[in-house]
């Protein structure tokens, strides 16, 4: 991953180097766990500081990944948002539960619970799959 600090002071770990960062959610969280491991295993204070800054970024911006019926895969600047596939939606839920276990931040628990409820709704699942398919047709 690559560290990117935006104009609002948010610390993002990007999965891909792009001119316009996309903030891929699962990649950010995977990389964040690497920072957490460096902090805990190496007792690295810089890693600890980066972990906390990135957690604050995630807490502040997590609502942007919620489209009111499913999770978004990323925050790209496309007209049509990139909906997560069912696999990645479920991965986001698991990742946020782990983030809650690591940090005790209720924000992570709240979104994991909300997204779990989204996934149990058949209409939401169908809508997400249709939107994901349309996204792929238009952008790939």
Predicted regions: what they are:
Residues 18, 36, 76-79, 106, ...:
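A generic structural signal for solvent-exposed, polar alpha-helical segments
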Residues 23-39, 84-101:
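Well-ordered alpha-helical segments within folded domains of soluble proteins
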Residues 1-6, 45-70, 110-127:
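Long, well-ordered core segments of solenoidal/helical folds
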Residues 90-140:
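C-terminal appended segment following the main domain
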Residues 4-26, 67-91, 130-140:
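Carbohydrate-binding/catalytic loop surfaces
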Residues 1-59:
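Eukaryote-skewed repeat-based solenoidal scaffolds used as protein-protein interaction platforms
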Residues 46, 50, 80-91, 104-107:
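Short amphipathic alpha-helical interaction segments
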């Amino acid at each position: 991953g690559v560290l990117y600090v935006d104009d609002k002071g948010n610390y993002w770990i990007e999965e891909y180097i792009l001119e316009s960062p996309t903030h891929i959610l699962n990649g950010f969280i995977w990389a964040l766990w690497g920072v957490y491991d460096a902090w805990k295993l190496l007792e690295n204070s810089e890693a600890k500081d980066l972990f906390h800054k990135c957690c604050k970024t995630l807490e502040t911006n997590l609502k942007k990944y919620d489209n009111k019926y499913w999770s978004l895969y990323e925050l790209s600047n496309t007209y049509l948002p990139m909906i997560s596939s069912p696999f990645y939606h479920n991965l986001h839920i698991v990742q946020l539960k782990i983030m809650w276990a690591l940090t005790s931040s209720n924000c992570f628990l709240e979104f994991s619970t909300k997204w779990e409820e989204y996934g149990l709704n058949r209409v939401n699942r169908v809508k997400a799959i249709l939107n994901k398919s349309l996204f792929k047709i238009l952008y790939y």
